[in-house]
Amino acid sequence: MKLGNLDLGNRLIVAPMADVSDAPFRKIAKEFGAGLTFTPMVSAKGIIDNEFHALRIFAFARDEKPIGVQLLGNNTEYLSGAVQELQRYKPDAIDLNCGCPVEKVTKHNFGAQLLDDPILMGKLIKSMVDVAGEIPITVKLRLGKSDGKINILETAKVAEESGASAVIVHTRTRNTKYKDDPTWDWLIKVKDHVRIPVIGNGSLFTPQDVKEMIEKTNVDSVMVARGALGNPFIFSRYKN
């Protein structure tokens, strides 16, 4: 699995999770076979403003690489500035969060709220890509706002055309949040719609879940979130 020029070694990625994805968690995931981990989501504005909380979140050690940083933002100036600042720390990938459905995030037009405005999303992605150099930019998406407003094919294409190296697709809508069963069939459609790698995400709790998602949808990689909580064995058992 490659993101731009970055070879992850395998298809297993650990999702950025608030209050979870700290250094000990990431190191354990790596020891059990994860190819790429992420720091928790961090505000682009917080990085620009040198807020201690934001800077502390994305601190990582060299032995954690490859490692990614996920940014939260809706402003091209803040996002491009944050990407330039992050280059000092040499992350291996930078993700734009367009998938968080939590109300305290979406009410400020962050996260999954951006799904309603693909034009703005494209501008945000391009602003990051233009200053990222060799660092691949990925985009975390959901299927759309609701079952009646699914626009994942449009947003995935916008991400590709704006220069993203991959899209990460959580197979639920914003309104569904983490309820109901994920809709993996959309991953097949996204794979047919874009040329960049597609990373599947949503209800991967066992090695069998990982295996089935890859086999049924042909995604290039998977991102495991809640399934890795207290269960790093999901990575080693899948690989074995």
Model-derived features: where do they sit?
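Flavin-dependent oxidoreductase catalytic cores
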Residues: 1-240
